[in-house]
Amino acid sequence: MTSIKEQAAISRLLSFLQEWDNAGKVARSHILDKFIETNQGKTAPELEQEFSQGASLFLVRLTTSLRITYMTDSCLEKLLRSIGIFLSAVSSNRYLIEFLEVGGVLTLLEILGLEKIKEEAKKESVKLLQVIANSGRTYKELICESYGVRSIAEFLAKSKSEETQEEVQVLLDSLVHGNPKYQNQVYKGLIALLPCESPKAQQLSLQTLRTAQPIIGTTHPSIVDCVLKVLGTMHLEVQYEAIELIKDLVGYDVRQALLKGLVALLIPSVKEISKLQAKILSDPSVLQLTPSLPMFLQQAAAAKAIGVLARNDMSIAEELLYLRVVRGLMAAMGNTDHSNSQRLASLTLECFVQMFPLVAEHVRKCMGEELYQLFLSNAEDLYMKIDSIQADILAANTVNVTKALCLHGSSYSMNTLYGSRDSAQMAYLTHFEEDVESKE
């Protein structure tokens, strides 16, 4: 026999459920407002007490309403927030299972792909997916098995709200942790985002890739080209994240490909330059846009990245010498169409000149005494002081430090400046020299 108190509670619950069932759009909106206000942050036992051990009866009504109305955006944000109260409650595993059993994950992912749904509702959908993903490995796998990575990545690329995009980053970060079965899928999805048009999405993808790379261990072959292309961005915050990722990636098996790619960007291809010249001849206004052309932005960013890498690791600096980085930097210094390339290349060349006496000798010989002294006195402002003839000399230089390094041995500069290397490092460099010599 139930007590009078219990009967009264059950009666209140039935009355509430009947009110919901009979309510129209406006009335349901008010019910949801009140539910959110009074139940935010409650635990599962507290929700059960509130609903006389029948909380699931209201949850099933919320999920049913969600499935029926989500395409019309009717009270969608409030519905999602209300469901979130159940799913995020402490000890709410039962509610989570009930939601998933009726296809909750697929509904949330579909919401992300619908253009007519408001951004705020999509953000709430992402938050629910976060709750599900944070509930354990099984739930992360369920999201991935529902083509979730693709849906989430596409939404990140298309979203117009930076706040929402940051919520998506949190979700992707969760999916890459503790998800060995599908972590590679998430990793590839992040790489696929790099060419997208949204600077914020690029920035967040690069940040998450830095977190994901140590978890994945191996690198995907496409990551090198994708990251190098991102260097052509006009957005400094994206460029910064790309360089930070490059700093991490040189510790993996793509190191040589990355270094070669960076050096190659210092001298734009003849094909690209010919395209630019053709555009200028047909439309002189293109001249005004040259500072923002991707190939020049890449050139400047590559010079900057090379400087960062060389200052951080002497062995990388020496590898770059074998890739003829000095020639590339001097060529960039002669690019009068892009002053930032000239400035950054000059600063990076200064670093190599200070680190390697042999480089200083070759640079001095190529520049001539007058230009070299100008360079030493203020490398950063050199581009403002050189004339067209000096710029042409720099752009057309044929400096080749590689042969001289091989003749003198890798210890020529480094032993003089920094003392002897350990045997493992010397063995690595000897192998690197032999590889270069075989290609000469």
Curated annotation (Swiss-Prot):
Xref: InterPro entries: ARM-like, ARM-type_fold, DUF5578
Superkingdom in the source lineage: Eukaryota
GO terms for cellular component: cytosol; plasma membrane
A Pfam family that the UniProt record links to this protein: DUF5578
Protein name: Armadillo-like helical domain containing protein 1
Annotated organism of origin: Homo sapiens
